Each structure stands twice: as C-alpha cells, then as structure tokens.
Design a protein with these regions (language model features):
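A short core secondary-structure module
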Residues: 207-251
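A short, Trp-centered hydrophobic/proline-enriched beta-strand micro-motif
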Residues: 174-184
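A glycine-rich, basic-preceded beta-loop-alpha segment at the flavin cofactor/substrate interface
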Residues: 246-248, 255, 270-298, 315-332, ...
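C-terminal helix-coil-helix/basic helical segment that borders enzyme active sites and/or dimer interfaces
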Residues: 349-381, 396-397, 470-483, 487
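Internal helix-loop-helix
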Residues: 81-170, 217-219, 416, 423
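C-terminal amphipathic alpha-helical interaction region
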Residues: 441, 451-544
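Extended, charge-enriched "interface" segments that sit outside catalytic cores
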Residues: 1-110, 544
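Extended amphipathic alpha-helical segments with heptad-repeat/coiled-coil character used for oligomerization
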Residues: 370-371, 382, 386-424
Length: 544
C-alpha cells in the first residue's frame, strides 16, 4: 500500500538474487565452447559463484554507494606535508577486493585463464564498471613487465595474486598489488610520440628521473604505473612505483581529479613528475613496442566491458517487460516491444561471442591466433564500443520514465556506456590501426580470412559480406577516409561467422538478415517480422 490513496500494482520486482553468469545463455555457451573439458567443472563453479555474488542485493548496493560517494583527492596532510592520496568509499574497496579475489587479474597463471577471466570480467562489469579499470590495467601490465625478467620476478606474482591490499607500501612488503598506466599528455592525446615528459638516466643502470606530466592517470592509488617518457634514445617505457623501497613516497604529484561524465566511482587524475624515480622497462626508444601488448589487452577489456554493459541493460529491459503490463498484456508479448528487445538481445549476444573468441585466441597464443588478434582486436574495439551507447539508451527507454530515474540503475549504465570507445584510443585510432595491420602484417588478414572462412557456405548473406569486404580491401588508395567503414565490416563479418557456427539458428538468421543482409533499420526494433523474435527474447531473459 502507498498510504490510503492507491494500491501499488504493475511494478516489476527488482532484478536481484540471480546468477548473472548462469542466466546468460550466450556467455555460458561461449565459455563451454572455448574451455577444454577438463577445466569446465572448476570454471563453472567459480563463474557461478561470481555470478551469484554479482546478482546479490549486497553487491548491487555497494555499487550504488561507490558511485554516489566519488573519490576525493588529498594532496597534503594537516601539517602541510605532501601525501598525494585519493580517498575512496569503503564500498569501492570491498568491490575491488571481490574482483581481485575472483582472479580478474590472474588470467596469466592457469590454463584457459583468459577465457575464464574474460567471462568473469564481463560479469563483473555488470556490478560496477569503475573498478574494472584497475583490474584491467593490472591484468594488462603483465606482458609488458615480462619483457624484463628482474621486474617480472618482483611484480608479476603480486599483480596476479588474489589478495587485495589497499595500503601504499613498498612492493616487497605486499602480497598483492595493482598497476596503472600513463601515456596521454595535454598536447598529444592518442599521439603518444608527441609526449614531452623527459627521462634523465641516473648512475644506477636502468634507473631514471622523470620530469613532466600525464593528463589522464586512472586509479592513481595503484602501486605502480607503466608510463612513456622521452629518454636519450627516444620514447621509452618506465615503471613508476608509488612508494620507493625505503618506504618514502615517490614524486607522483596529483594535481586534481577529473569531473567525468561517468565512471564516477573510479578516480582519474592529472599527475606531474618532478624528480620522479623510475625503472626502465625494455630498451630505450622502444617504448611503444614494449607497452603494445598491454594496450592490446586493455583494448580487449574495452570490448568485454561494453559487452557487459550491454548485457546488464538488456537484462534489465527484458526483465521489466516480462512483468510490466500495458494495453491489455505484458510488454514482452507486444509485437513491437518484442522486436525491440530481440534486436537489443541480438547486439548483446554478438558482442559477447566476439569478446570470448578473442579471449580464447589469447589463451592459444600461437602465431595464427596472434595474427588474428592483431586485426580483430582494434576492429572489435571500434565496433562493439560504438554499439554500446545506443543499446543501453534503447534499453533504458524500454523502462519508460522509470528508466530515466537514477534508482533504476539505468542512468549509471548510460553514463558509463561511451567510455570504452574513448579509452585506449578512440574510434579513429582503432580504425586506422586496422589499416596499419593490413599494410604491415599481411598474415593478419590471412588469419582473419581463415577464421571467417570456417563459416563459408552456411549462410549466403555471410558469404556475400565476406566477398564485399574483400572487394573493399582490393584497393586501399584513399583507405584512410574509409577506415571506419572497413573496421565495421571486419567486426560484423567476424561476429556473423561466429554466430553462424555456434549460435542457435534463429540468432544467426536474425544477425545475418539485419546486420549483413540489409534487412534492418537504423534504430533497434526493425528486425524482419518473419524472424523468431520470441526465441531471441526468451534466450536473453535473466531467469532467477
């Protein structure tokens, strides 16, 4: 009852108490497909436990608290001493501890680790996307650190630990550590070769002093950072610890925290280096080459993060429409709403399937799979992150006015949705990276064609899309102006090939018709009415 004025009816129950992993049929199928059979029992148990935690009222409340109480910068203590600390709400630390404890930075430590971790990361993004940032950077720092055996021995066991220690202490005193990275500067943005931060060698081999700044430095309370700076031989990668071996704070000077559209639980800082101690990682002048694997890993996490946000939004929309009645029946049963939900579910599943396939390529590690990643990761990062915002906004509209209210959780998803398209290089950077791979690494295109070729002959619309892509690539003159179109086609063809091979026929048919065959519109809810829309929606229901 609501006082004596009316009875509250026709309001869907909150979507809580369910297994976020186990109720996601597309994600479960992808994990089962890519993991070796002997790994499945353990992975099922771990992912279901994480999924149940993610769907719990407690963790969802922590997510709200972490976003309603954003981080706060403290540059000095009460005596005027420089401390450069960021205070987070306790809910942030609880969530981050859960994420680290679930192995979301430990993909490198066990067989099938990338697929297992990718599924977990996709689930975890649906709880609170902000703490995905330090989890992602910590996970991604491992391959860069492994270029230096001494640094790897010191740091990698701590980065891949399942222990979260929030206190800033020397690395040698910690069982677990988090990592960040800093590349962007005011004058350059994505053009890191324009960086002006300088590195002056010290007497001890491999050590330097940095002078300069970074314009965006997320998760600034991490234990260490990989940064790019100009050494005597050119742009070089460095490790900057927050705390030095003797326990003193490094000169890591936090200037202010960014006021951001979304990602409010996570701190993104402007930082200055003034006599900042650093260790070189890799050779001088090879900074981009050293850090490139870290960038590739975080770009894949942008794909997974966007897939997670889409799944969260679609699950809320389908759940709402399964309970809400209007015009004589459930919204779920209204033909037009069913079309909208089916279209959204299709986009969500395509993103999930693509993200898990790329994670499986990371587990494989062979030359063929690495070549595939070289072209597929930037294409996927370009396309999936671009699709996230329209999916989330349309899903929020399915809730009507309720979806515009903060308590629904949908506004937080909307604010978060554009971020992954900006992180680790915006859309143009990704599209141009696809072109770079085509020109410099012909084996990447060969690996891609071999991958999508496994589905040839199964659907005429997919076959035609592959042919059209090859026609597009036949002449790369003026390709820069077509780079987005090319990247989009790469992503769609790869998604289509995976769905044709592995998804239920109704899913593959709908994707090929609307995304490859031209039988769809510019907005969601324009699928051909002859498709099995009910099956698509039922597959997406987050059944408790």
């Amino acid at each position: 009852m609501a006082g004596s004025t009316h009875t509250v009816t026709n309001q869907p129950p909150p979507l809580l108490g369910h297994d976020v992993y186990g109720t996601d049929q597309a994600l479960v199928a992808a994990v089962e497909r890519h993991l070796d059979p002997e790994l499945l029992d353990e992975a099922r148990g771990e992912l279901s436990a994480l999924g149940r935690a993610a769907g719990s009222a407690q963790l969802q409340e922590w997510a709200v608290q972490a976003n309603e109480n954003p981080p706060r910068l403290r540059t000095h203590d009460r005596y005027g001493h420089r401390i450069d600390e960021v205070d987070f709400h306790p809910a942030w630390h609880r969530l981050l501890g859960k994420g680290v404890g679930a192995g979301l930075t430990a993909a490198w430590t066990r067989p099938g680790g990338h697929v297992r971790r990718a599924a977990g990361f996709l689930v975890w993004t649906q709880v609170e996307a902000g703490n995905g940032c330090p989890l992602s950077m910590t996970h991604a720092a491992v391959p860069a650190l492994r270029t230096d055996p001494e640094l790897a021995a010191e740091w990698v066991p701590r980065l891949t630990s399942t222990i979260y220690e929030r206190e800033l202490r020397p690395a040698g005193q910690k069982a677990g550590a988090l990592f960040g990275m800093g590349m962007t500067e005011k004058q350059g943005g994505s053009d890191v070769r324009a960086n002006t931060t300088s590195a002056r060698p010290l007497a001890e081999a491999g050590t330097y002093v940095l002078t300069g700044h970074k314009w965006f430095c997320s998760a600034p309370m991490s234990d260490g950072f990989l940064v790019l700076a100009q050494a005597p031989e050119g742009l070089t990668c460095f490790l900057v610890p927050r705390v030095l071996e003797d326990g003193t704070r490094n000169r890591f000077l936090l200037q202010r925290l960014k006021e951001k559209l979304g990602n409010r639980s996570n701190a993104s800082a402007e930082v200055e280096f003034d006599g900042t101690w650093a260790r070189r990682v890799g050779e001088e002048g090879r900074g981009v080459r050293t850090i490139i694997d870290m960038v590739a890993a975080t770009r894949l996490d942008c794909v997974l993060g966007s897939a997670g946000l889409m799944r969260a939004a679609v699950a809320q929309a389908v759940h709402h429409c399964a309970y809400r009645e209007a015009f004589g029946g459930r919204l779920l049963d209204q033909p037009l709403m069913r079309n909208v939900l089916a279209d959204l579910a299709l986009e969500s599943e395509a993103a999930t399937v693509l993200g898990l396939r790329l994670a499986a390529a990371c587990d494989d590690g062979g030359e063929q799979e690495r070549a595939l990643l070289r072209i597929a990761v930037p294409a996927a990062k370009y396309w999936v992150t671009k699709r996230c915002t329209p999916v989330v906004v349309e899903a929020a509209e399915c809730l009507g006015g309720n979806g515009y209210v903060e308590e629904s959780g949908m506004p937080r998803l909307v604010r978060e949705s554009p971020l992954n398209s900006v992180w680790e290089g915006a859309g143009n950077v990704q599209a141009l990276d696809v072109l770079r791979a085509l020109r410099r690494e012909p084996q990447a295109l060969n690996a891609f064609l071999q991958e999508v070729g496994r589905a040839r002959g199964a659907d005429h619309r997919l076959d035609a899309a592959i042919k059209d892509l090859l026609t597009e690539l036949a002449d790369l003159d003026g390709a820069q102006a077509r780079a987005r179109r090319i990247a989009e086609r790469f992503a769609l063809v790869l998604q289509g090939s995976l769905l044709v091979r592995f998804a239920p026929p109704e899913v593959a048919d709908a994707f090929c018709a609307s995304r490859l065959g031209g039988d769809g519109g510019g907005a969601f809810g324009t699928l051909p009415h002859t498709l099995d829309l009910r099956a698509l929606v039922e597959r997406a229901r987050p059944l408790a």
